[in-house]
Amino acid sequence: MNIRSNPDTTRPAVTTGALPSSRKIFSVPEAAPDLLVPLREIVLSEGAGEPNLPVYDTSGPYTDPDVTIDVNAGLPRTRLAWVKERGGVEEYDGRVIKPEDNGNVGASHAATAFKAHHKPLRGVGDAPITQLEFARAGIITKEMIYVAERENIGRKQQLERAEAALADGESFGAAVPTFITPEFVREEIARGRAIIPANINHAELEPMIIGRNFLVKINANIGNSAVTSSVEEEVDKMVWAIRWGADTVMDLSTGRNIHTTREWILRNSPVPIGTVPIYQALEKCDGDPVKLTWELYRDTLVEQCEQGVDYFTIHAGVRLPYIHLTADRVTGIVSRGGSIMAKWCLAHHKESFLYTHFEEICDLMRKYDVSFSLGDGLRPGSIADANDRAQFAELETLGELTQIAWNKGCQVMIEGPGHVPMHKIKINMDKQLKECGEAPFYTLGPLTTDIAPGYDHITSGIGAAMIGWFGCAMLCYVTPKEHLGLPNRDDVKTGVITYRVAAHAADLAKGHPAAQLRDDALSRARFDFRWQDQFNLGLDPETAVAFHDETLPKEAHKVAHFCSMCGPKFCSMKITQDVRDYAATLGDNEKAALYPEGSKLASGMTMKGVIEDGMTQMSEKFKEMGGQVYVEAEAVKESNKVL
């Protein structure tokens, strides 16, 4: 692992280099031989006796040793040619960056602007612009081919077992196929059941898909605040998050230099970037929600569309008639965006401008193919408030808005709670599918209990695994700092790894055809005492090695046939291996001693056959004794003499 930056600049240093015993490889789709779809290959030890394991990779070129990273130049703009090739877009000058875009920060506190400037694109006319419009028109885009190839990692090896894996899982109505084709991707997008968040101005993007019939995805939140962090830290957090498996990243910056921070992140991000535009709009009016206007908000949307933001959280479901429903809650309105709009509605005693101008928002977002992430501004902030009328009233409105956005050609996913105890989670998934026409669900956890500040990555990981199993398409991570402070680099990693576990557990439970490949490979390595393979097949090899080395630090311990838990004498796997090895070395004489001449095993009967024969004898004996559960002891003794 290396920390690289351009030696001629003080701009962000980011983590590069491959993960332990891994290498970047590329898959070429048959439908588009010009595409290179990245994946990570975990290289197993020579004695493994099995092939290396390919896994889904979110890390972009940062883990490719053949690529020189220069954050000042940004990543290659590969998608630009795809977008222009399709047509229906125009290049234009774009809006001028204004002082308020960065919070009117003074020169002494202004962050260095990203130097490379690219003119933005926007859609023109009625030609398809969004992935949804292309899908409905029967057109398979390069993005669709790309994500189909990514989703199929491991499925080719598992084709023979795919049906069995699907049958073994419980998908709760999801239609996970044995193999993902570009046509299947197109159909899912056309039906609104999946989205490819991919702004036409985010040319650096490696496309991915969000939907319940695909791998469960996770999102990591980053962003500065008025009191802490910088551009350098946030770019590094983004790269760090995707290194460990974040499929998307949301920039939730609320402090200075919001525009500049976002530009640096976007130009260096291979994953979709989401934002909550109301945060920046609020900064433009000195943090006073009452001063917000539709015109100011719309200008902020244009600004972020031109930069390349892939999805917007918009709290258009927080309506004036619903606010009073939160009055009796234990924790009221906990969403920042929701509370901002609630205050605006009450101050002006008007319906939310996000709701009244929703069709205009759709028209604007369509021009750039920015996806909606319809925000749950009235989500419960405590388990006491879970599944109340305020939460579900907003969800019903989000269903109404979903239909409007779809009619306008926009891609949509729906945000969900929050704080929900385990027994109330499934109704959230079921109601979302019903109200929102199976649009992808994207939830924050949910946290299943409120008693563990400092451990809410665990309280939420439990709920995330459950709702992912029930059909949630993307899980928003929670870090140990939830409710306590702004997460640092270590917290980001902990949150991402926790949610990778939850997402993978959900894929297993749904019966994803290739999900168990990695589990089985690691289990075999564990049984064979291939310690290095165990470490490297895990989600976090570095932590696994560190924990092992705390008690067994010598290199010789990494080939030992025991661990510190049981020691050499009591290791169950070692004992099992010894028994197997002993059985394999037995000669004919020893086997004859174990299975005397005339015994059923010696005659060739299988152990199962011997057991079944014995059970039959005992059944007959039960009948002979009169068929009674309890009998006299003397009678049993006499019966045994006969046998």
Curated annotation (Swiss-Prot):
Coiled coil: none annotated. Zn(2+) binds at residues 419, 483. Its EC number is 4.1.99.17. One of its GO terms (cellular component) is cytosol. Substrate binds at residues 221, 250, 279, 315, 335-337, 376-379, 415, 442. GO terms for molecular function: 4 iron, 4 sulfur cluster binding; carbon-carbon lyase activity; zinc ion binding. Its cofactor is [4Fe-4S] cluster. The keyword Transport does not apply. [4Fe-4S] cluster binds at residues 563, 566, 571. It catalyses: 5-amino-1-(5-phospho-beta-D-ribosyl)imidazole + S-adenosyl-L-methionine = 4-amino-2-methyl-5-(phosphooxymethyl)pyrimidine + CO + 5'-deoxyadenosine + formate + L-methionine + 3 H(+). Keywords: 4Fe-4S, Iron, Iron-sulfur, Lyase, Metal-binding, S-adenosyl-L-methionine, Thiamine biosynthesis, Zinc. Binds 1 [4Fe-4S] cluster per subunit. The cluster is coordinated with 3 cysteines and an exchangeable S-adenosyl-L-methionine. Pfam families: ThiC-associated, ThiC_Rad_SAM. Pathway: Cofactor biosynthesis; thiamine diphosphate biosynthesis. Signal peptide: none annotated. The keyword Lyase applies. GO terms for biological process: thiamine biosynthetic process; thiamine diphosphate biosynthetic process. HAMAP family: ThiC (MF_00089). Homodimer. Catalyzes the synthesis of the hydroxymethylpyrimidine phosphate (HMP-P) moiety of thiamine from aminoimidazole ribotide (AIR) in a radical S-adenosyl-L-methionine (SAM)-dependent reaction. Belongs to the ThiC family. PANTHER family: PHOSPHOMETHYLPYRIMIDINE SYNTHASE, CHLOROPLASTIC, THIAMINE BIOSYNTHESIS PROTEIN THIC. This is Phosphomethylpyrimidine synthase.
